[in-house]
Structures are given as C-alpha cells and as structure tokens.
C-alpha cells in the first residue's frame, strides 16, 4: 500500500485491527479507499463497511476495461512502482514464551536482525520499519495463543531473512 501511495503521492493511514477504524476515516473524508488483509475493502461513496464482493467486482471491471489479465496488470504496476513481497505467519506460543514475548514487544528496539530500526509504529503492537521498503510487525492474537508476524521486503530472499529473524526474535529468551 505504502509503495503505491508514495508513487501517487497520497497519505497512508495505518489503523488498529478492526474495519471500524477504516470506516471512520472514510466517513471523515480522510481517505478514498480502505482495506485490510482479509480482502475487505471500502471506497468512499459506497458502503463504509468492508466488502469483499466490491473488491472482486472492481478487479473484474479493471480486467474488462483494460483488456489485460490481473497478472499482466500487476506486472505493469510492479514495473512502475516496484514489487514487494510480504507474508503473514502465525506462531503458536507456550504460556512462558508468550509472557516473555509480550514484554519484548513493549520495548523500543534500535536494531532488528543487525539492521537499524528507522522507525517504530505502535498503532498495532510493534511494527519495526527498517527502511522504505522493509518492515516487520508482530502482534499477539486476541483470540488464541499465537503471535501474528507480518513481514514485507522488496525481494523474496530479504523476506525469507526477515521471517527467520522474526521467528528467532519470538522464540529466543
């Protein structure tokens, strides 16, 4: 999202978990488009609630109007703004690991995997921004004994390295 927003240039708002926060931004006319990882999407002027069907219809419309497949359109977009790789993993935690991790997530970190942390965002627990195109976010689930780890990087090898570092961060004492 940020890569695309930077290209246009428009602001990006990161909210806590819950589409209600995105709906509020739409109602306040702060954003035109809002989405979340579960394919929930809303566009100002439509429903201020998440709607996966709208997202699918808009993709179908883009394919029909442009005469190019989704894959072709993504390739063109990535050529313009640069590709990013991302992943979400759930790591199941034993109670002692969970307690230790919660304390670690509340600290401010200057380095992650020997790389400098340029910025910390606490909108949703701990997001460590490493540079313009790489970051790691860790947050405990509110419903099960897992930590959700999100990583983004410009290449697959860098993403794999971030995932390995995140797993080590979670499980190392």
Give the positions of each predicted feature.
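Phosphate-binding and adjacent anionic-ligand microenvironments
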Residues: 1-173
């Amino acid at each position: 999202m940020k890569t695309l927003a930077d290209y246009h240039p428009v602001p990006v708002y990161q909210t806590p978990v819950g589409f209600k926060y995105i709906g509020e931004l739409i109602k306040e006319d702060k954003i035109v488009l809002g989405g979340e990882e579960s394919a929930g999407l809303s566009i100002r002027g439509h429903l201020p609630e998440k709607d996966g069907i709208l997202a699918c219809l808009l993709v179908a419309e883009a394919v029909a109007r442009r005469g190019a497949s989704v894959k072709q359109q993504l390739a063109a977009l990535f050529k313009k703004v640069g590709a990013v790789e991302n992943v979400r993993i759930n790591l199941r935690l034993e109670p002692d690991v969970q307690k230790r991790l919660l304390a670690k997530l509340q600290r401010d970190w200057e380095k992650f995997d020997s790389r400098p942390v340029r910025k910390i965002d606490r909108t949703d627990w701990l997001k460590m921004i490493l540079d313009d195109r790489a970051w790691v976010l860790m947050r405990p689930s509110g419903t099960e004994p897992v930590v959700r780890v999100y990583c983004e990087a410009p290449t697959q090898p860098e993403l794999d390295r971030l995932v390995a570092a995140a797993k080590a961060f979670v499980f190392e004492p």
